[in-house]
Amino acid sequence: MKSNKNLIQLVESNHSNKTLPQLQVGDTVRLGVSITEGNKERIQATEGVIISKSNCGINLTITIRRVLQGIGIERVYLLHSPKLKSIEILRKSKIRRAKLYYLRTRSGKATRLQQRFN
């Protein structure tokens, strides 16, 4: 079993060439995602609150939630994907849960999270 773990770590270390910021659940982030339209490539910025983190290592994913025109939009991003060009932390929040799925049932001011200043 140890040789399998070492082999997995070796493969993951070769493919995870990104240095990621310290992301936590509750942070408001802006992601730059590369989108190809025909033969053009552009970077689209998406912004939202991280409501969950899943997996580890090279398979690390985050779920981002944002409400646009009264409709909640959630998207899952693979953090070590080559399509993800930039990650910027806009705001850190003080939370006491590992998953913020309860934000799905709230609306308006109830979705605000208390800001952390450290």
UniProtKB/Swiss-Prot annotation:
It comes from the Eukaryota. It is found in: Plastid, Chloroplast. The keyword Chloroplast applies. One of its GO terms (molecular function) is structural constituent of ribosome. GO terms for biological process: translation. Gene3D superfamilies: 2.30.30.790. Signal peptide: none annotated. Belongs to the bacterial ribosomal protein bL19 family. NCBIfam families: rplS_bact (TIGR01024). This is Large ribosomal subunit protein bL19c. PROSITE patterns: RIBOSOMAL_L19. InterPro entries: Ribosomal_bL19, Ribosomal_bL19_CS, Ribosomal_bL19_sf, Translation_prot_SH3-like_sf. GO terms for cellular component: chloroplast; mitochondrial large ribosomal subunit. Keywords: Chloroplast, Plastid, Ribonucleoprotein, Ribosomal protein.
